[in-house]
């Protein structure tokens, strides 16, 4: 019985010494068991290393074990395991059930138990207790020593949960974490390790469970050799926590205490002092780094480095791209093998997708050394979303998460049809399970004939029944059961009914054919995982009564704990992983990416359930548990040391200055430390681009990424920029390569690509727009905004996906409709706006809105509390609006005469006929919200009012550009009709926009009701263009003095109009505008019918027509594409507009 330390710094050859010692023992033919004990993740590499040292004939004489493997060997020999092991998934499900049962008895964790991740946290603390040999009884016995209610209640809660967990677990199972405790108890009966010589390698520390096992082994074995990565032995002295080797020296002290307690001999240690060490014999730089990284004071290395390099990059993507280039260069120039290279990071989750994408492009074989979560696997999504559908009352999200797994008998086209219908009509809850067919109209009557509508509805219902039949059956079967076991049985039947096992097998075969070995391996494990989880539910809580929601939560908890381990598909590949897994691989070239503050070294972990103070207090009372976060932080530097000293040939550290979102990243303190040691270190960056052939050569690596760089340079050449000659040679190489020549020629042709198609044939455009052309004025304005957007909307009739919601345009139409009905009711009752009873008016608004709510097409306003609030808001706005209209009417002599005046074949007036230069007539249709008339001095003055639910300004500049034509063409049409039909002398009075709103008035505490009303009137002042006639103006606002608070006019003290502060036009100017608008519309319509579909959105200083355009994904407008330019519209002053309009009309002889 003896213990021997084998110690030395990193790279000194401790592992090799162990292997050679084993070889020597075999050659000496000493008859005793020879065992190499390593951590679980090192066992595979250790076996490979041992085989390389020993020949095939002698290799079998040595066992490579981990603590877990050792436990299984002993249990097989002497017994000890009579129950199955429960995995992490089963533990989590059991803990969920225990916490649910005891939630009312918990003192501290009652609220926390509802939080996501709490079960995992509790599972982790129980695992920690077990590893530190703490039982529920030990916790309870120490409660009286705990001061402070918070910690005491925490420990009481933990003892309650832990105790019930142990009791219920051991009915049918055993915890994996109990293996080492049982191993320590059973080792006395085992003969396997009697007189054995054991070498223990690659450990930096042990848990109390492992120390217990080591103690038993020390008492049975001939000798235990333990490697320690340290510069010298501590020999039981106090350990300085700032020492990089402090974790190792703490381990040494504990082992010394064990042999002292058991009177075990300490053999003379083996000191592997080396200069240079075996690992660094070919690199003085890496040897210097090992010696000085954590030495104080350190020794500078002044020579230029080639084995240690740094890279500063713009972002994470360019960092990995540069890493890929460097790997290719090493393999080509220095004959490096992919298997000798590792890429590691402290943020594998953040880098995983980038590395996968870039390495695939550079054709670098790689394996990401991590376990995969299964939560996003379609099979798991199908199962959980099916239960979520039933437990969350058939929400849209859960239903389509279930349907979109691709594991049901419904194709993508059927899925899209069903989803569009569901979104458009807000289908949810009972509507899915109701046997009645869905009858909501999918389209408006003018879009599809009734027969087509019926056929489409029939198809939608067929898809619905086919898609929902399995889950509806599942729902019925669930309703008649209440035990966990029964839920598992019904769920299993459901999975078999949809042929899931066969579908999984077919998918596995497809993955194999496509060469996706990792995917095939993943899917191969999933079904067994699901069955294992269901089995554990049955065995642990099978007879307990639970609800569907509880079953869903338990199953979700169980499946969330599973991770899939994948086997590397080949040996020669770059290993990608986290820093903690690095030492399990033999590598000579190491790339550490993401060497940034907070990533490497790792940041302090959260304290968890037990704070650092809690842990210190418990430790002082004799309850030793895992280290606090500060101790772990000190130990992190040993992990940094181990990482930096892993490679034997080449080390590169890289750090981006920004993450994927553009947020600034700072370099790690490790960067500055190494720069101080290596004053002339090899350092590169990709932030400042240098010119020259040498720099361009870095972009030539694998065929695919080089091809992308080539295309980029060829485009520069086409655009007239100078490129390096090397790209000409590269171009020739691709031209001579059969695989690439077609792609190259296709992309070069793409340099001439334009998304423009300025005109299409007149015949085709006629078929799309119809003949004769009949359009609304708003469509004419739309064409002015962008011809292509008009073509897509009205020619191709492309529509945005219909969603069950109330948009602002919908709300505006709704309010217009109510106001129209109210206006007609007012006429019907023989009432006037200026004398109506306001209480009656408000009741009428309520009545009209309530009647509309009973209409099936407005179901949405009854669908939620949110829309109930919207309805209340609409009522307030409309009540405020009718009050405001009444106030406007009171203030003037104009009288409302027409409401929703229409221009159409069956309208109040016929369509507005516009004769084109070809002689063809275009019919304009539309509707005016309100027309007020004034009879004065033998003339009839018109005030045209357009209700707007949002803010709207009148701009002469927009009239000039054809963006604001509606009110003027309506004015022209009405005046024309009055003259031609009735011989009435009509005159323009005003064109106004009235905003429908109920504005909030601030600081009303000291304001009277009258002052509040004045403030509201002023806030809702109309915008537009007024006839520059003081008398007519007073007929619109008979109390005007200075600036009007209802119309955009200011009068001077002498009664004249202040033209600079008013939006006014003379009778002659109105006439000019009428001519200009007719001319503009004719020009636009002719352009439209000529087939102009140019992608030419307007752009002004306050925005462009692209800002809210839903067709941007269709046109792909981009000013970098040839021919893509904005139609720049410069805002003109009113004087400039008048001048420009007159000049244009004169030029056209109009």
UniProtKB/Swiss-Prot annotation:
[4Fe-4S] cluster binds at residues 786, 1106, 1109, 1115. Its EC number is 3.1.-.-. InterPro entries: ADDB_N, DNA_helicase_suAddB, P-loop_NTPase, PDDEXK-like_dom_sf, PDDEXK_AddAB-type. GO terms for molecular function: 4 iron, 4 sulfur cluster binding; 5'-3' exonuclease activity; ATP binding; double-stranded DNA binding; helicase activity; metal ion binding. Binds 1 [4Fe-4S] cluster. Keywords: 4Fe-4S, ATP-binding, DNA damage, DNA repair, DNA-binding, Exonuclease, Helicase, Hydrolase, Iron, Iron-sulfur, Metal-binding, Nuclease, Nucleotide-binding. GO terms for biological process: DNA recombination; double-strand break repair via homologous recombination. ATP binds at residues 8-15. It comes from the Bacteria. Its cofactor is Mg(2+); [4Fe-4S] cluster. Pfam families: ADDB_N, PDDEXK_1. Despite having conserved helicase domains, this subunit does not have helicase activity. Belongs to the helicase family. AddB/RexB type 1 subfamily. NCBIfam families: addB_Gpos (TIGR02773). Heterodimer of AddA and AddB. The heterodimer acts as both an ATP-dependent DNA helicase and an ATP-dependent, dual-direction single-stranded exonuclease. Recognizes the chi site generating a DNA molecule suitable for the initiation of homologous recombination. The AddB subunit has 5' -> 3' nuclease activity but not helicase activity. This is ATP-dependent helicase/deoxyribonuclease subunit B.
């Amino acid at each position: 019985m003896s213990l021997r330390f084998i110690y030395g710094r990193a790279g000194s050859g401790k592992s090799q010494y162990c292997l050679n010692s084993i070889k020597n023992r075999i050659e000496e033919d000493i008859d005793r068991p020879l065992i190499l004990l390593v951590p679980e993740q090192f066992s595979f590499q250790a076996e490979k290393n041992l085989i390389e040292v020993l020949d095939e004939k002698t290799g079998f004489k040595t066992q490579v074990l981990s603590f877990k493997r050792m436990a299984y060997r002993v249990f097989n020999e002497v017994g000890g395991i009579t129950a199955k092991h429960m995995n992490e998934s089963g533990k989590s499900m059991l803990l969920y059930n225990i916490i649910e049962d005891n939630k009312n008895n918990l003192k501290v964790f009652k609220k926390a138990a509802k939080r996501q991740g709490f079960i995992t946290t509790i599972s982790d603390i129980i695992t920690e207790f077990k590893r530190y040999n703490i039982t529920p009884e030990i916790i309870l016995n120490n409660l009286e020593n705990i001061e402070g209610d918070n910690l005491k209640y925490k420990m009481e809660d933990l003892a309650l949960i832990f105790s019930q967990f142990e009791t219920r677990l051991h009915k049918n199972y055993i915890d994996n974490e109990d293996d080492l405790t049982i191993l320590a108890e059973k080792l006395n009966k085992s003969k396997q390790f009697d007189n054995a010589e054991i070498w223990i390698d690659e450990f930096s520390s042990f848990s109390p469970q492992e120390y217990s096992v080591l103690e038993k082994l020390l008492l049975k074995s001939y000798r235990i050799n333990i490697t320690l990565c340290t510069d010298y032995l501590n020999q039981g002295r106090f350990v300085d926590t700032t020492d990089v080797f402090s974790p190792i020296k703490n381990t040494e002290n504990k082992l010394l205490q064990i042999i002292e307690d058991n009177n075990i001999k300490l053999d003379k240690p083996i000191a592997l002092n080396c200069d240079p060490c075996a690992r660094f014999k070919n690199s003085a730089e890496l040897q210097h780094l090992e010696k000085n990284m954590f030495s104080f004071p350190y020794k500078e290395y002044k020579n230029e480095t080639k084995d240690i390099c740094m890279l500063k990059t713009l972002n994470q993507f360019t960092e990995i791209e540069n890493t890929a280039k460097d790997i290719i260069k090493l393999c080509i120039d220095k004959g490096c093998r992919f298997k000798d290279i590792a890429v590691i990071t402290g943020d594998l989750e953040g880098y995983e997708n980038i590395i996968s994408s870039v390495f695939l492009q550079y054709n670098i074989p790689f394996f990401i050394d991590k376990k995969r979560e299964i939560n996003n696997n379609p099979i798991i999504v199908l199962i959980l979303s099916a239960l979520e559908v039933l437990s969350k009352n058939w929400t849209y999200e859960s239903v389509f998460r279930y349907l979109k797994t691709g594991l049901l008998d419904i194709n993508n086209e059927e899925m899209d049809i069903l989803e569009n219908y569901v979104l458009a009509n807000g289908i949810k809850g009972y509507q899915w399970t109701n046997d009645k067919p869905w009858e909501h109209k999918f389209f408006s009557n003018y879009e599809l004939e009734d027969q087509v509508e019926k056929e489409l509805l029939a198809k939608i219902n067929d898809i619905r029944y086919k898609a929902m039949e399995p889950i509806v059956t599942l729902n019925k079967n669930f309703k008649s059961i209440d035990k966990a076991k029964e839920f598992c049985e019904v769920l299993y039947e459901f999975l078999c009914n949809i042929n899931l096992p066969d579908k999984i097998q077919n998918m596995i075969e497809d993955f194999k054919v496509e060469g996706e070995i990792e995917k095939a391996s993943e899917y191969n494990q999933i079904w067994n995982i699901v069955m294992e989880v269901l089995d554990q539910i049955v065995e642990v809580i099978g007879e307990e009564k639970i609800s569907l929601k509880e079953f869903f939560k338990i199953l979700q908890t169980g499946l969330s704990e599973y991770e899939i381990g994948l086997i590397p598909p080949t040996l020669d590949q770059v290993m990608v992983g986290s820093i903690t897994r690095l030492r399990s691989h033999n590598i000579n070239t190491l790339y550490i990416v993401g060497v940034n503050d907070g990533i490497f070294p790792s940041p302090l972990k959260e304290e968890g359930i037990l704070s650092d103070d809690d842990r210190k207090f418990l430790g002082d009372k004799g309850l030793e548990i895992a280290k606090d976060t500060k101790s772990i932080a000190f130990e992190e530097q040993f992990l940094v040391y181990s990482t930096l000293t892993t490679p034997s040939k080449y080390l590169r550290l890289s750090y981006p200055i920004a993450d994927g979102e553009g947020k600034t990243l700072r370099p790690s303190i490790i960067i500055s430390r190494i720069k101080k040691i290596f004053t002339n270190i090899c350092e590169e960056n990709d932030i400042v681009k240098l010119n020259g052939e040498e720099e361009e050569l870095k972009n030539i690596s694998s065929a695919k990424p080089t091809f992308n760089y080539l295309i980029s340079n060829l485009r520069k050449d086409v655009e007239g920029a100078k490129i390096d000659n090397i790209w000409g040679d590269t171009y020739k190489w691709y031209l001579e390569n059969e695989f690439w020549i077609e792609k190259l020629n296709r992309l070069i042709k793409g340099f001439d690509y334009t998304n423009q198609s300025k005109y299409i044939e007149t015949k085709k455009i006629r078929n799309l727009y119809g003949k004769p052309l009949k359009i609304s004025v708003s469509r004419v304005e739309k064409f002015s905004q962008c011809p292509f957007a008009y073509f897509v909307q009205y020619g191709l009739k492309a529509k945005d996906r219909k969603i069950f919601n109330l948009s602002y345009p919908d709300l505006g139409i709704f309010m217009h409709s109510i106001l129209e009905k109210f206006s007609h009711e007012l006429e019907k009752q023989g009432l006037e706006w200026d004398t109506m009873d306001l209480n009656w008016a408000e009741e009428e608004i309520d009545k009209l809105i309530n009647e509309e709510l009973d209409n099936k097409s407005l179901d949405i306003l009854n669908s939620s509390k949110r829309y109930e609030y919207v309805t209340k808001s609409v009522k307030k706005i409309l009540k405020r609006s009718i009050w405001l209209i009444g106030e406007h009417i009171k203030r003037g002599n104009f009288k409302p005469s027409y409401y929703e005046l229409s221009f159409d074949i069956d309208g109040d007036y016929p369509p507005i006929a516009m004769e084109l230069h070809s002689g063809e007539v275009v019919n304009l249709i539309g509707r005016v919200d309100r027309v007020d008339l004034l009879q004065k001095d033998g003339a009839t003055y018109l005030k045209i009012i357009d209700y707007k639910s949002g803010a709207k300004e009148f701009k002469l500049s927009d009239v000039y550009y054809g963006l604001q034509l509606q009110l003027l063409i309506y004015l022209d049409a009405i005046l024309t009709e009055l003259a031609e039909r009735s011989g009435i002398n009509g005159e323009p009075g005003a064109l106004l926009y009235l905003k429908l709103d109920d504005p909030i008035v601030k600081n009303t505490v000291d304001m009277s009701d009258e002052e509040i009303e004045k403030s509201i009137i002023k806030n809702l002042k109309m915008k537009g263009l007024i006839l520059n006639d003081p008398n007519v103006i007073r007929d619109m606002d008979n109390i005007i003095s200075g600036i009007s608070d209802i119309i955009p006019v200011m009068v001077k003290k002498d009664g004249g109009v202040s033209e600079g502060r008013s939006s006014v036009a003379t009778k002659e100017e109105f006439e000019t505008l009428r001519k200009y608008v007719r001319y503009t519309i004719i020009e636009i319509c002719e352009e439209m019918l000529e087939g102009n579909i140019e992608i030419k959105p307007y752009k002004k200083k306050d925005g462009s027509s692209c800002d809210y355009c839903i067709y941007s994904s269709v046109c792909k407008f981009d000013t970098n594409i040839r021919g893509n330019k904005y139609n720049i519209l410069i805002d003109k002053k009113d004087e400039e507009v008048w001048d420009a309009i007159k000049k244009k009309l004169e030029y056209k002889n109009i």
